Amino acid sequence: MNPLIMSIILATIILGTTIVMTGSHWLMIWIGFEMNMLAIIPMLMKQHNPRSTEAATKYFFTQATASMLLMLAGIINLMYSGQWTGVKLVNPTASIIMTLALAMKLGLAPFHFWVPEVTQGIPLSSGLILLTWQKLASMTGLYMISPGINLNMLMTMSMLSIAIGGWGGLNQTQLRKIMAYSSIAHMGWMTAILIYNPTMTLLNLVIYILMTTTMFMLFMINSSTTTLSLSHTWNKMPLITTTTLVTLLSMGGLPPLMGFLPKWMIIQEMTKNNNIVLPTIMAITALLNLFFYMRLTYATSLTMFPTTNNMKIKWQFENPKYLSLLTPMIMMSTLTLPLAPMMMILN
């Protein structure tokens, strides 16, 4: 893609997200979402093949439907409150419709079907933006309306997302689909704590973005899209293989790595609010995610598929990109668990 066009697209995506995050007027928030959606579609289609076109079309229809519901909720709120400004929704119907719209944009279950399909059909770089940056605006919207959200509806969607995110990733060999299902599960964890402690949701979002970015950068360095191609990392980059192992385990939430911190803090916060059953179910369901990440770890680092002799010396000729950026990213996404006491004080 032309660098000038790419710069304009990225600037529009950033501007759209910024408008949503700083806006208090429902019409401006809707405009920010529309800018964001229309700007990312060319990035999804930059490979010019039928799969990318199909993925971009699915993304467009889903996001357009969610934007329509968002506008409907804003209009209903206008009818009852008499103003566009103010993010507090005074009408329960408007609150429910707005929650459904933002859940559809985030990819929460039962509106999750588009996430694996779209992620599978686009390049890794576009998948990184879709599963990280594109979550910021929608999660900010949920944060804004969190005081008026229907608790039962939100917790139902959260539990479904955590369960489907774990079950859906079990039989996958495509890395992009695994990351998509992992994203659905992580969104479920974040929205589960939204009612009790919205600030903790934002902290967990930062940790999720950090880990997912690190994971996608490792995939892009190896040009890996399947479990089999990831298993060849030993031959190409032995050092990267070791870091991939640790990052995968962190994504699975294994202590004492950074990925364990969000689950620990969420379970602790929900337990303090006398909610025992749901955190127990969430913790058990999280084992599904850990299982498929352990399977990826085994395929990547603990076994080596049959290869030719030429493949075994490829590591001498590799000059990986992103290495200067990747080192601090890996350290932050795996080794920052000792900062947990400070983060808990901030909450």
From Swiss-Prot:
GO BP: any one term: mitochondrial respiratory chain complex I assembly
Gene Ontology CC annotations of this record: mitochondrial inner membrane
Keyword DNA-binding: no
UniProt membrane topology term: Multi-pass membrane protein
Pfam families for this protein: NADH_dehy_S2_C, Proton_antipo_M
Entry's EC annotation: 7.1.1.2
First-level EC class: translocase
The entry's keywords: Electron transport, Membrane, Mitochondrion, Mitochondrion inner membrane, NAD, Respiratory chain, Translocase, Transmembrane, Transmembrane helix, Transport, Ubiquinone
Role noted for this protein: Core subunit of the mitochondrial membrane respiratory chain NADH dehydrogenase (Complex I) which catalyzes electron transfer from NADH through the respiratory chain, using ubiquinone as an electron acceptor. Essential for the catalytic activity and assembly of complex I.
Quaternary structure annotation from Swiss-Prot or TrEMBL: Core subunit of respiratory chain NADH dehydrogenase (Complex I) which is composed of 45 different subunits. Interacts with TMEM242.
Family: Belongs to the complex I subunit 2 family.
Name recorded for this polypeptide: NADH-ubiquinone oxidoreductase chain 2
Provenance organism: Ozimops beccarii (Beccari's free-tailed bat)
